Amino acid sequence: MNFIDQLARAERLHDSLLCVGLDPEPGKFPGAWKGDAGKIFDFCAAIVDATKDLVIAFKPQIAYFAAHRAEDQLERLMAYIKRTAPDVPVILDAKRGDIGSTAEQYAREAFERYQADAVTLSPFMGFDSIEPYLRYADKGVILLCRTSNPGGNDWQMQRLADVPGQPRLFEHLAHRAQTEWNRNGQLALVVGATYPAEIARVRELAPTLPLLIPGVGAQGGDAQATVQAGLVCDASGASTGPIIVNSSRAVLYASAGDDFAQAARRVALATRDALNAASAAARR
């Protein structure tokens, strides 16, 4: 089953657009685990167990593991999710961006070492920086397009004078991803929840692509505005490409106590329900 089909299955089974990001910070762990990088797997596995029936995907961020020399714990976690939540696709948030043989090795890392179902990439170096990943025909390749950070304006909002119509960089990327780059139907785009107008513009340019939308929760994105911008429906109520709305810190650190997993579930459930309410409104 390819990544797009996995998303559709998880959305249907769990009635969810919510992706829980797994960004472990040992300094925020509860109780006796606080500050202990050796507990990264245990913490993340507890979050997975508490939320796996509420999500469309999980998204571990590789830097939060690598910084603590915990890549082995990430491997364990990926295998654990595959075993205990086999209907939930896993997005490896790596944001790699390189070319040639280096890109080939990064692709092997994501899809062979970690067995991810999809990976995030920076496409700044062009198509040959993503092509090695597209050789894995059943995997998702998710390109940074319009990111939620303020510095995204430095490049993404600049107009391209040499391209007909002088689109902004993020618009040009969305168009390319929807058309000539999407040879096997594997591509998706990252669009930050803090910019609903740009989500709507990306959806206009890339009507069938999945959109991974971070920024709901701790970064201040509004769930209703996010869903209404990204989920466009026709007269029959059928929607365009799926949306994957990520929340990380708001779920992971809902409590600093021993009830952290239960608190994470409560926040995940409330977020899922808010997204579903917005989805229902968008379909009317």
Curated annotation (Swiss-Prot):
> Quick one: a GO biological-process term for this protein?
'de novo' pyrimidine nucleobase biosynthetic process
Reaction catalysed by this chain?
A: orotidine 5'-phosphate + H(+) = UMP + CO2
Q: Give the matching CDD domains.
A: OMP_decarboxylase_like
Q: Which InterPro entries match?
A: Aldolase_TIM, OMPdecase_AS, OMPdecase_type-2, OMPdeCOase_dom, RibuloseP-bd_barrel
Q: What is its EC number?
A: 4.1.1.23
The pathway that the record names for this protein is: Pyrimidine metabolism; UMP biosynthesis via de novo pathway; UMP from orotate: step 2/2
Q: GO molecular function: any one?
A: orotidine-5'-phosphate decarboxylase activity
Residues of the active site: K95 (proton donor)
Q: Which UniProt keywords apply?
A: Decarboxylase, Lyase, Pyrimidine biosynthesis
User: One Pfam annotation, family name?
Assistant: OMPdecase
* Family, similarity comment: Belongs to the OMP decarboxylase family. Type 2 subfamily.
**Entry's PANTHER family?**
OROTIDINE 5'-PHOSPHATE DECARBOXYLASE
Q: What is this protein called?
A: Orotidine 5'-phosphate decarboxylase
Species per Swiss-Prot/TrEMBL record? Leptothrix cholodnii (strain ATCC 51168 / LMG 8142 / SP-6)
